[in-house]
Structures are given as C-alpha cells and as structure tokens.
Amino acid sequence: MRERDLADTSGWEPWQQDYRFGVILLMPPPHVAAPIDALRQAYDPKSHAICSAHISVSDPLRRQLNDDARKELQELLRAVEPFDVQYDRPTASARRPGVAYPVSPQERFDELKRVLHQSSVFEGFAYSRRDIPAHMTIAEFLTIEDSLRICADLMDRAPRGSFWCDRLEHVVPDATFRFQRRGTFLLGTSR
C-alpha cells in the first residue's frame, strides 16, 4: 500500500484513526456471510455499512502493509493449519451492549492471534481489545436493553453452522470508513 492509497482520515472519529492501515479479518464465505449480513443490516445498519460479516483476528496495523510485511505475514501464517469454524446461537450480555455469535474452537483463534501479532506490522503496545474472545458480531452500536431484546428475538431463528477457515483478509477503510479488501493470506503449507 502506497501513501496515496491511504484514505483521508480528516473526517474520522478519534477511535477510527487506529484503523488507518487496516486490520486482518476472517471473512466467512458468501453462503455463510449473506444471512449474517442480512441480520447486521436489519439490526445494526451502521456496523453493516462499515464492514460485512467478519471475525476480528488482529489488532489494527501499526504501519503500512508493504511487500516485505506481506511476505512476513504469509510466512508466519504458513505455520497455522486451516480449521473448521463453528458458530451457534447468538449471545448478548447484561453488562455491555452487543449481539454476537460465539465462534469455536477458541484455541485455534488464540493461536492465530498469537502468530499474527509476531509480525513487525504490530510492533508497539498491544491493542486494548486483543484479549477479547473471537466472535462474529451481529450488532454493536445499540443499548444493552436492545441487545438483550434482539438476542431473544434471534435465539431460535438465527442461522448457525460451520465453515472452513483457510484464509484471512487484509481490509483497509476508505475515506468514509468503509472497509475494503486489499489482500488475502492463505493458512497452512499446502498452496
């Protein structure tokens, strides 16, 4: 990514500035993402507009992802074998707003995060949300009461299932803070 490829961040909120160089996400395949994106659109259009269905697996990048950094990340990810991701009934908390699918196996996501954060693009302090368990958000910009109501509404009708994780996506926000795919990293040694 060249400097001219970076978005004009002058209109962004302070918390959005951290994401200037992007983030690494697990993006579910289209047949999984489509019904989850429909829920995101219905219950939290703001989140849906920012990014489609995903599972966050990295801190925001600390610097631009140049060719050397891409090679470094790809080499690190060769050590992580692809795995099956399970997602079940959405959950909500009485302590903080949001509705999300818990995903498993959490140990594989922890391994993925550990390996990713060895890269030089994450040098510096650990981002405050690094230790949050991996999950797939349905809605986040709402109240606790709305979260609990939505979760109850979705309990028996939200899709659930599994999908194969064999790749990660580098996504970067544009000037309107809408994330765009910029690159793909394959997991494991079989390419």
PLM region descriptions:
Residues 1-191:
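Histidine-dependent nucleotide/RNA phosphoesterase domain, centered on the 2H-phosphoesterase fold
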